[in-house]
């Protein structure tokens, strides 16, 4: 707030009506009446003139006005409502929602409007309402979702990242050792995006339809000619699929992406993949490996190069740090991390969570790669190359 001696009484009172009692205390009556204010305006009564009339020290009076204004601003800050939207992986949506509601019940001072949807609801509305209209206010103060292309494309959410709208406020200085070691550094070095976990992609091999082929144990194996038209891919899961394309490109170039297209037999939802009998190999989120019987024709393979991951992002607006503080602490905390890791097999970045990966490697394309490439254009090129391979 800014108060100067030259401001008119009318402008002060109209902008800061909470100052009326302060004026009343020194004998100014009727300032809640527009007609009185207009008359003072016509007489060009400034704050300095008013204090001369009342024989008050203007320099001592201004802090009293500022205190009245500040007290109301503090009250306003205390009741501001934060907004949270999450698109959560289906297996953990309900337990996370229940945990959050319990947390809110224990912390009555948190004021938040929230909606935690299943991930299949999709992100199309963000492109329509937030990105195309360039209206970041349409996005919740906190937004949780996977979204590999959405968050890194400079024409999509990437443009808001460059403006410094988001800030990692989790306070986690070092990610879980599964994501911070000699092979992987997942934490955003620019401090814009925070993450709560990842969705790893693994293989399920149906040995009954290998027809003499060896069990593929690496991404490189899937690109071999013998696995042409033999693999189911989660194309409908755009986040994971785009992440797979980018990682294959980084490892094996556009030829590798085309070979992955050649390997495509069918495009199924992960839940359908478990029942599919034709593909020799299905690529799916690690969670669905729970459904594979220990004894049977199907074998769960953790790729030798590592499970390709699609991060679960948590975007928080820097301007809403105060309103989001306790919500950030919960969503980035160990309780949520344990739920992700144990109920969803989605490894958590929280340093104290024991992830269900048992030291097995995970593949992350890397921040240097992301910052040195136009990710939106690269994903489009990879998609085109994949389709070329699939059409052969």
Set out the residue ranges of the language-model regions.
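Ligand-binding pocket segment of bilobal, Venus flytrap-like solute-binding proteins
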Residues: 152, 234-306
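A structural signal for short loop-to-beta-strand junctions that line the ligand-binding cleft
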Residues: 132-134, 140-144, 168-202
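A bilobed periplasmic-binding-protein/Venus flytrap-type ligand-binding module shared by bacterial periplasmic
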Residues: 202-209, 309-322, 339-340
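Early extracytoplasmic/lumenal segment of secretory-pathway proteins
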Residues: 73-155
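Extracellular/periplasmic juxtamembrane helices and adjacent flexible linkers that interface
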Residues: 76-79, 322, 329-392
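Short helix-loop capping/hinge motifs at secondary-structure junctions, enriched
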Residues: 208-216, 250-255, 319-324
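Short loop->beta-strand "edge-of-pocket" segments that line small-molecule binding or catalytic clefts
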Residues: 220-240
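Short beta-strand->loop
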Residues: 163-174, 294-308, 318-319
